[in-house]
Every structure is written in C-alpha cells, then in structure tokens.
Amino acid sequence: MTHQPSFSQAEFADKKKITRREKFLTRMEALIPWAKLLAVIEPFYPKGERGRPPIGLERMLRVYFLQQWYGLADEALEDALYDSQALQGFARIDLTAEGVPDATTLLKFRRLLETHDLCKGLFAAINTDLTARGLLLREGTLVDATLIAAPPSTKNKEKKRDPEMHQTRKGNQWYFGMKAHIGADRDSKLVHTVVVTAANVADVTKTAELLHGQETQVHADAGYTGVEQRAEIVALKRKID
C-alpha cells in the first residue's frame, strides 16, 4: 500500500537520531499483514452512503493499534497524534491537510470491532501470517498471566457490577477486574494465544488452553507450580519447566 509522505514528514525522517518509539513502529509496520486485516473488517465498515464519508479504514485500524500499544484514552490519543510526528507517520495522517480522528470516532470504531467480534479474526490473521513467514517457530511456548485492573465501581450496560469481573489478591495488593492468560512463542516472544477470564481465576487452570500443540517445550514461572499434575496437562504429555 503506497503512501506519499508530506513535506514535514520527509523533513522529520531526515533527522539523525532514531527513537525507540520509531524503531518499534517501523517493526510493527513490517510485521503486520495490513491487507489481510483490512479484509477482516471491511465487510462491516460503514461505506458512507449517507452523510459525510467515514475516515479511511486503514487509518482507523492504525490509530486503533496505537491506542492499544500505548494504553491511551481516547482524548489522550487524540492529543498524542497532534504532538508526535512518529505517530502521525504511522497513522498516515498529514496535519497540513486533515485532522486526527476525534474521541467519538475512536469509540465508534472500537464498538464496531466489539459488536462483530472482529478482534479474534484480526488475531488469527496475524498469527497465520507470522507462521507462514517463519516468525512463529512453534517449538516452545512461554505461558504467563497479567491482571487487567478496573475501578471497583465499573458497571455494565444494566448499571450493575460486571459479573465477569472479580477481586483477587497479588502479594499484599487487592485488584478488581480481569486477567489475560498468554501463550507466547519462546524464540520470537510473539503472542500466539490469549484467554481472558475474571481476575480470580488461577493461572494453572488455563495453561492447556495456551498451548498450540506443536511445541516440544513449555516454560512457566513459579505461579504455575504443580501444573504438570493437572489431568489436562498429563493428557497432552508436555513437560513444563
């Protein structure tokens, strides 16, 4: 997909120091199979038959990824896009000709992905492409879990405390929210599987779901002590260290 940089972007590209953010974004640009991801979303994306035409799908997807990578709220992302030429370049936004997507537009795009459960399709398309390119070697899997904290006052659409969220204790600290159980390729460190549960679900109970079945080794930290004795792991005949 061709993209003509603006004069300011070309000038920015000539500077001598390359920041860590720029290196990361350059790597993501090369890794992500953009055409395949756009094909997942395109059937559900507004065509603009009525009213003003929607912002281009690729730009919205790029902005969405930036929001996820840097953990920015809608308004903070809007500000960051105005402030950072590196982010503008990745999102393919030329401020001399256009503005950045506002908070309402960002929210609508996220809801589109959620309503049609498109994130699973995006994740699957990325992993299929990485495997085909030999970037997911699939010989070993690292398993881990991370808490996704939410304010205890978080309510669902019915204005009730979300039943999918629970409290858990880690060390001396209590958390309320969800937990992401992650399986990652040992060599590339790229994530191949994610299972999301309530925060109080024990790490060991989801281990088998994080394995793709082709690995010869599984690596886990002390939080997975005793996992080898679980029936589902014994059945898989996988040694975990």
Q: Language-model features: where?
A:
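Charged, often Cys/His-bearing segments associated with DNA-binding zinc-finger transcription factors
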Residues: 1-34, 42-43
